[in-house]
């Protein structure tokens, strides 16, 4: 019995030992340094950015009351959300004629480009920062000895900084257009039944855009985080060391010349 149980116990312990070895190899103190701590913030705020934008949904509406007593008051409720292709969202406009009951209408505008770019950038930032944290914590010696890793990290960090600025600004402008297109007054202005004398239209509840506004704020926070991290990543590159060597070179030579003059 003991001979049969020993292989099974060894098989059970081997995955645990591998996990323990992996956790022991992680240098958690790297998270206390700016290079690792900012990466954690970038990872978190990337989740907040694409999560708040990608999960947004709202509704707008209006009330149409026909002067014809045969028809009741019609309530129009239009649901919209990410990716904000408003021109594909349908709603039924009531008609006050006796012949037909309603007409299919669409919201105006397509704002999917800035929204999808914003969410895609957040997802890429999430995966890159997660991979960078693994390198910092597990393979930091390889990161410091191989000069290509800091150079690649610096170039990618600068690129993400630029893209976050563009994405946050573009999505901020797109969100402003979304607010204008989904405003209840815009909804009533687009319905022809509201321009005649056969009906009276009133605006419904204004859409709550709080989560979408926060997503724009998270976008600019990501920009500042990536911009601030550029300096700390640059310090790990060979370019920073060359700048220090060039700055110290003339001072050391002048000190040597002064020592030679004093000896003479």
Swiss-Prot record:
Annotated tissue distribution: Skeletal muscle.
Positions glycosylated per UniProt: 213
Swiss-Prot/TrEMBL keywords: Glycoprotein, Membrane, Transmembrane, Transmembrane helix
Record topology, Vesicular segments: 55-116, 172-213
Pfam families recorded: MARVEL
Localization in the cell: Membrane
Superkingdom assignment: Eukaryota
GO cellular component entries: synaptic vesicle membrane
Membrane topology, from the record: Multi-pass membrane protein
Protein name per UniProt: Synaptophysin-like protein 2
Organism: Oryctolagus cuniculus (Rabbit)
Lineage: Eukaryota, Metazoa, Chordata, Craniata, Vertebrata
